[in-house]
């Protein structure tokens, strides 16, 4: 399940489609935005159904009842919403909906531990922040600009200390 709508969410959704992921659930507070992205991606999910009657590509509103059902059916949640940029933000997913079987990736890289990642740990689930994504985006940009391998270890250290 992907909380998508902005640039990072769209990029992650497109990569999921290009990699032919088995199932993608797009969740957004503005359902029309998610539906538009669903239409763009639909051709990548038009093949045979591997999961029986379960939709391979689905759009849901970012509402507790819709999230509750989906979270019981999936393994990976990607938060690409801005919720969590500030430490005072609430978790975009209520802790009562999180379960140990979930892996949560919070694309936010502003802080090591976001409200969602704290809730994830409290629920006994696994989580990761967006620092690795930021690191490898920066490394790729470095290699394009300077035409040499990026100093990944030094870049990682700067991010962690930074």
Task: Give the location of each predicted region.
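Conserved S-adenosyl-L-methionine
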Residues: 17-23, 122-126
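Hydrophobic Val/Ile/Leu positions in short beta-strands of Rossmann-like dinucleotide-binding domains
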Residues: 1-2, 26, 106
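Rossmann-fold cofactor-recognition segment
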Residues: 45-64
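Rossmann-fold NAD(P)-binding glycine/threonine-rich loop
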Residues: 85-89, 94, 100-152, 156-158
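Glycine-rich adenosine-cofactor-binding loop
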Residues: 1-17
């Amino acid at each position: 399940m992907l909380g998508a709508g902005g640039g990072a969410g769209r990029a992650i959704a497109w990569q999921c489609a290009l990699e032919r992921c088995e199932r993608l659930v797009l969740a957004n507070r503005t359902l029309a935005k998610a539906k538009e992205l669903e239409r763009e991606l639909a051709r990548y999910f038009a093949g045979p159904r591997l999961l029986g009657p379960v939709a391979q590509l689905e759009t849901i509103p970012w509402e507790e009842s819709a999230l509750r059902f989906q979270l019981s059916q999936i393994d990976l949640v990607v938060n690409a919403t801005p919720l969590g940029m500030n430490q005072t933000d609430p978790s975009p997913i209520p802790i009562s909906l999180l379960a140990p079987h979930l892996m949560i990736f919070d694309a936010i890289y502003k802080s090591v531990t976001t409200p969602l990642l704290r809730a994830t740990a409290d629920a006994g689930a696994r989580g990761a922040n967006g620092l690795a994504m930021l690191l490898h985006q920066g490394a790729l940009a470095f290699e394009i600009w300077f035409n040499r391998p990026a100093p990944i270890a030094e870049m990682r250290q700067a991010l962690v200390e930074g």
